[in-house]
Amino acid sequence: MNAVIQYILYLAVLIALAIPLGAYIKKVMNGEKTFLSKILTPCENAVYKVMRVNKDEQMNWKKYAVSVLIFSGIGFVFLFLLQLLQGVLPGNTQGLAGVKWDLAFNTAASFITNTNWQAYSGESTLSYLTQALGLTVQNFVSAATGIAVLFALIRGFIKVKADGLGSFWVDMTRIVIHILIPLNLVISLCLIGGGVIQNFKSAETVSLVEPIAVSAEGEIIENAEIDLEKNIVTVNGETVEDAEIVTEQFVPMGPAASQVAIKQTGTNGGGYMGVNSAHPLENPNGFTNLIEMISILLIPAALCFTFGKAVKNKKQGVAIFMAMFICLALALGSIAVSEQLATPQLAQDGMVDISTVEQAGGNMEGKESRFGIASSSTWAAFTTAASSGSVNSMHDSYTPLGGMVTMLLMQLGEVIFGGVGCGLYGMLAFAILTVFIAGLMVGRTPEFLGKKIEPYEMKWSVLVCLATPIAILVGSGIAAAVPSVADNLNNTGAHGFSEMLYAFSSCGANNGSAFAGFNANTVFLNIILGLVMLFARFLPIIGTLAIAGSLAGKKRIATSAGTLSTTNGMFVFLLILIVLIIGALSFFPALALGPLAEFFSNVM
């Protein structure tokens, strides 16, 4: 019962914060006054003046798309070079060398696409300058890019017989200055108050409370008896040769809180530490865990209400929100039950306690004892529903069904809230597909929000909906055919295949989380995963802007008795059905070879 209350609390807090934020974002989109305008509008106007931006410019969809691509391309080149040259640049207190070209390519592609896939550990690979000037900046602008494209699509629904969708540069400026900076400033201060580190100190070394012994391979020796004076390690009276006694701990420092905040709110997901928000210095307690977890879905959920207010049809925004929310709740319930019940092998003979949600119960492998099953499962559902990818537990250690649900949430196209901006414009593409199919069934010309849906919009909508499945399946298919990829798997068989499929699902969905048993830092994998991320990010953006441009040029059709309602429960059901059918048809064969095969091998 305590677990149920905990899950309900998380969801209730999310909704309570999303509604007012959605109203605020709508005002920012339209350039209306907000309670922060007196402070922030002068900053906004200063940016326009310095950058010589015409705030009244109206770009057509092609110019808007070119602006997005040029801006992202410049960010890619800058971040790529910053990593290569970090060894000779300042802000490198640990003296770290430049990053290899293939890893630099992968990381640059990852962060400009809002994926934040990390084939490295940040605290031991990247300097403070690279983290702050490279990654954190991209965390802001990649998130803003997704929201800007959504703004353009919303204007496509609003405008009548128009060509312009607004200015990309104005949208980016307003989003960063009025939304992302204020929100993340507040969250950063809360995280610092909760114990997340924020400094520019060099890494420190501290003494352990008691020494530990490790083997020559670096593995901890269990039941070891340590004699510090003689430097001898024994187990059951026998001396362990080549054993090393460890008495000190390396503690990374740095500006973590500021990066963690935008990592969460921008659905970026790339952690300051290698183990992300499972690290006690990045997420030390329940208070910081709650803030970070709610932050994942805060903007994606708020944008649903922004959409409803902007198109002057609040019920439409609520309908889209409910479709996402129902899918999220079902996924959360599935993960929570799977992790609490563990596997038949763990549950047999009372091997683990599965009767409560206390920290020792259920499948606790890969989870932090300070969070337990409930907080870990909720985070797993939130981070894969959004295109975040941040973690507070290791998804590779989840049960087969629990891991499959996290994978499926990404494979659906990251439209169950999804990334900031991109999740909603992806779901709206599914909504267009839904009204078209429904129109065919009843013999009516499909229309959505007063705009007629014709073959042009359908072609682009299908492309937006299928970009993620194509990227994932083609990429993982190529990788599966390369023998050397199998050497990078910590496991064989069904779980090994799941590790590889999860990696490509994560990159294809611009998520960034991973089954940690997959070593992705090779030249081949860095390049192919980078290409998958770029394809899955920018093809839907181009498709969305093409749809927006077409819709803006159409006249508005009056609602009639034959118009399909897109705000009732039936439409919500149809929308969910279309999303699930496309996901199931696309990925069921692959899931059958991975997590489903692993599940049935455990129960039989």
Regions found by a protein language model. Name each.
Residues 1-106, 150-151, 158-162, 166, ...:
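N-terminal alpha-helical transmembrane segments of multi-pass membrane transport
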Residues 7, 56-74, 167-185, 311-328, ...:
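Alpha-helical transmembrane segments and their helix-start/interface "positive-inside/aromatic belt" motifs
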Residues 9-22, 71-84, 148-155, 185-194, ...:
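Hydrophobic core segments of alpha-helical transmembrane domains in multi-pass membrane transport
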Residues 90-134, 198-294, 348-422, 486-535, ...:
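P-loop potassium selectivity filter motif centered on the GYG triad
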Residues 126-200, 287-318:
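A conserved hydrophobic secondary-structure block that centers on an alpha-helix together
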Residues 164, 305-311, 440-455, 486, ...:
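Alpha-helical transmembrane segments
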Residues 287-318, 325, 387-459, 535-536:
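Long hydrophobic segments that form regular secondary structure
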Residues 429-433, 438-442, 459-485, 489, ...:
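C-terminal catalytic subdomain
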